[in-house]
């Protein structure tokens, strides 16, 4: 773990010692080397040894999210170059420092083997994200968005702290490996139900669950490009990761208490997808799309079947890359027409045809078209939901149709149509932007060729049992 964490921390002195001419080259190259170094950490399901120690652990759930975090850091730096062009050198370095601190917090959060350390790092990610939104956002409303983000996250996390302290008092430890041995099945009592709700509240707000999602569109719309990318791609996944980790320790409470959350998720999935059809702001549409996709992850994580856990892990990785790519494309539009309103960008296909190709690719990935990994994740979740309840296929099928509608609506409104006369002197697309889109779409397609590396905990356990069974027969 330290071979990823220490080089990431060393990005801070590299940033402050680099001259203006070499700042972007040094940080982008070095962070890309770190992301390539992290790729072997994709957990191989047939590897029987878990990487556990007192402080850090790596398993088949945390490794895909860890690699995703490392992969997106150089992409965030590449996407921010034009945005920070007019800033002073000191502010550029401060911006990069905030991103590195956020990245380091995420690495420790995804690999911490103790739940209290995970909680502390879960909260630590709030600080650099808040600074990025409130200092480098575009409009004055960024302060209001920062307040929403701060209070939703803090108020939701307080019950989780109380629940963890209670578990520590009862068990004497919060270590993930020890808890899986020590915890007996909980009785269905009022106190245990309260404990379960306290654990889940913070993660439901972070996902976010429909009804607790008001902070997300505000934060996305007002954040700069790197803030939007890390929010959509990584920070929302902390919620799904937390649900899947904690729910294993609170059995069988999840089985009794999941119904209101699944019903609300299914209803919210339809509502937020429908809201996307009425949006005029491009970043707001992508933000509501994230709420809709994360509702699927909540459903899969709470059902807790083998297929649903696999689907949730895949969809978290796939959505991280897809939504990040969509925000990058929205940023390329904003840098040229200086507006997030979709109708003002119509006709861009005539000027930037290659960018329109990237828009088409990202929209098709968003609606889970093969050969992207999104399709496998959504199919697994729909299959698991149908096995859990036949009625769910109606809502999930309707959501799939609406997702296709708003994805095509986003594409046609922002790229096709009659050319607007206010766009007179637009500069062309850059190689940097095309490289950025390639590094987003390439993992989505390549992972579909061999998805076992991101199938998560349940596939790993299934492979382990199959291997041991074969060995016992021989």
Swiss-Prot record:
<feature type="transmembrane region" description="Helical">
    <location>
        <begin position="224"/>
        <end position="244"/>
    </location>
</feature>
<dbReference type="Pfam" id="PF00361">
    <property type="entry name" value="Proton_antipo_M"/>
</dbReference>
<keyword id="KW-1278">Translocase</keyword>
<dbReference type="GO" id="GO:0048039">
    <property type="term" value="F:ubiquinone binding"/>
</dbReference>
<feature type="transmembrane region" description="Helical">
    <location>
        <begin position="22"/>
        <end position="42"/>
    </location>
</feature>
<feature type="transmembrane region" description="Helical">
    <location>
        <begin position="350"/>
        <end position="370"/>
    </location>
</feature>
<keyword id="KW-0679">Respiratory chain</keyword>
<keyword id="KW-0249">Electron transport</keyword>
<keyword id="KW-0496">Mitochondrion</keyword>
<dbReference type="GO" id="GO:0042773">
    <property type="term" value="P:ATP synthesis coupled electron transport"/>
</dbReference>
<comment type="similarity">
    <text>Belongs to the complex I subunit 4 family.</text>
</comment>
<keyword id="KW-0830">Ubiquinone</keyword>
<dbReference type="GO" id="GO:0008137">
    <property type="term" value="F:NADH dehydrogenase (ubiquinone) activity"/>
</dbReference>
<dbReference type="GO" id="GO:0031966">
    <property type="term" value="C:mitochondrial membrane"/>
</dbReference>
<feature type="transmembrane region" description="Helical">
    <location>
        <begin position="195"/>
        <end position="215"/>
    </location>
</feature>
<keyword id="KW-0813">Transport</keyword>
<keyword id="KW-0812">Transmembrane</keyword>
<comment type="function">
    <text>Core subunit of the mitochondrial membrane respiratory chain NADH dehydrogenase (Complex I) that is believed to belong to the minimal assembly required for catalysis. Complex I functions in the transfer of electrons from NADH to the respiratory chain. The immediate electron acceptor for the enzyme is believed to be ubiquinone.</text>
</comment>
<feature type="transmembrane region" description="Helical">
    <location>
        <begin position="60"/>
        <end position="80"/>
    </location>
</feature>
<feature type="transmembrane region" description="Helical">
    <location>
        <begin position="257"/>
        <end position="277"/>
    </location>
</feature>
<dbReference type="InterPro" id="IPR001750">
    <property type="entry name" value="ND/Mrp_TM"/>
</dbReference>
<keyword id="KW-1133">Transmembrane helix</keyword>
<keyword id="KW-0472">Membrane</keyword>
<feature type="transmembrane region" description="Helical">
    <location>
        <begin position="284"/>
        <end position="303"/>
    </location>
</feature>
<dbReference type="InterPro" id="IPR000260">
    <property type="entry name" value="NADH4_N"/>
</dbReference>
<dbReference type="InterPro" id="IPR003918">
    <property type="entry name" value="NADH_UbQ_OxRdtase"/>
</dbReference>
<dbReference type="InterPro" id="IPR010227">
    <property type="entry name" value="NADH_Q_OxRdtase_chainM/4"/>
</dbReference>
<feature type="transmembrane region" description="Helical">
    <location>
        <begin position="145"/>
        <end position="165"/>
    </location>
</feature>
<dbReference type="GO" id="GO:0015990">
    <property type="term" value="P:electron transport coupled proton transport"/>
</dbReference>
<protein>
    <recommendedName>
        <fullName>NADH-ubiquinone oxidoreductase chain 4</fullName>
        <ecNumber>7.1.1.2</ecNumber>
    </recommendedName>
</protein>
<dbReference type="Pfam" id="PF01059">
    <property type="entry name" value="Oxidored_q5_N"/>
</dbReference>
<feature type="transmembrane region" description="Helical">
    <location>
        <begin position="114"/>
        <end position="134"/>
    </location>
</feature>
<feature type="transmembrane region" description="Helical">
    <location>
        <begin position="93"/>
        <end position="113"/>
    </location>
</feature>
<feature type="transmembrane region" description="Helical">
    <location>
        <begin position="308"/>
        <end position="330"/>
    </location>
</feature>
<keyword id="KW-0520">NAD</keyword>
<feature type="transmembrane region" description="Helical">
    <location>
        <begin position="435"/>
        <end position="455"/>
    </location>
</feature>
<feature type="transmembrane region" description="Helical">
    <location>
        <begin position="391"/>
        <end position="411"/>
    </location>
</feature>
